[in-house]
Amino acid sequence: MRMLLHLSLLALGAAYVYAIPTEIPTSALVKETLALLSTHRTLLIANETLRIPVPVHKNHQLCTEEIFQGIGTLESQTVQGGTVERLFKNLSLIKKYIDGQKKKCGEERRRVNQFLDYLQEFLGVMNTEWIIES
């Protein structure tokens, strides 16, 4: 009986340890990355001959591929080491997060009514959060 109690407590402890999130929340990661970007801006602009394509419109969520290509270019031209490495590591984690979220865009066949609800929500976000150019 005593052994069963010990095993139960051990299992409960193991479950607790594995249930604690070990990753930093994405919102905190983004805040930290913004601070690092501000801190290392001078170092990052040291190469004034480097040209990186910048998306024209302001709907940033549509340009994630271009943004991360630019980050890759910047990283390959920046001297690595020290604290700037943390910036690029964070940016890589943010990209993984976005890529994971994009996988949720996978198609699932649903009824027309459900699609129209989704379309209405999409247009509502577009109407309130996107910068619509005339």
Swiss-Prot record:
GO molecular-function terms, A-Z: cytokine activity; growth factor activity; interleukin-5 receptor binding
KW Protein transport (keyword) present: no
Residues passing through the membrane, by range: none
Predominant cellular place of this UniProt entry's protein: secreted
Signal peptide: 1-19
Annotated Gene Ontology cellular component terms: extracellular region; extracellular space
Residue positions the entry lists as glycosylated: 22, 47
Subunit structure: Homodimer; disulfide-linked. Interacts with IL5RA. Interacts with CSF2RB.
Protein name as it appears in the record: Interleukin-5
Domain of life from the UniProt record: Eukaryota
Marked site positions, Not glycosylated: 90
Subcellular location: Secreted
GO terms for biological process, alphabetical: immune response; inflammatory response; interleukin-5-mediated signaling pathway; positive regulation of B cell proliferation; positive regulation of DNA-templated transcription; positive regulation of eosinophil differentiation; positive regulation of immunoglobulin production; positive regulation of podosome assembly
Expression by tissue: Present in peripheral blood mononuclear cells.
Pfam family, one: IL5
InterPro entries: 4_helix_cytokine-like_core, IL-5
Family per similarity comment: Belongs to the IL-5 family.
Free-text function comment from the UniProt entry: Homodimeric cytokine expressed predominantly by T-lymphocytes and NK cells that plays an important role in the survival, differentiation, and chemotaxis of eosinophils. Also acts on activated and resting B-cells to induce immunoglobulin production, growth, and differentiation. Mechanistically, exerts its biological effects through a receptor composed of IL5RA subunit and the cytokine receptor common subunit beta/CSF2RB.
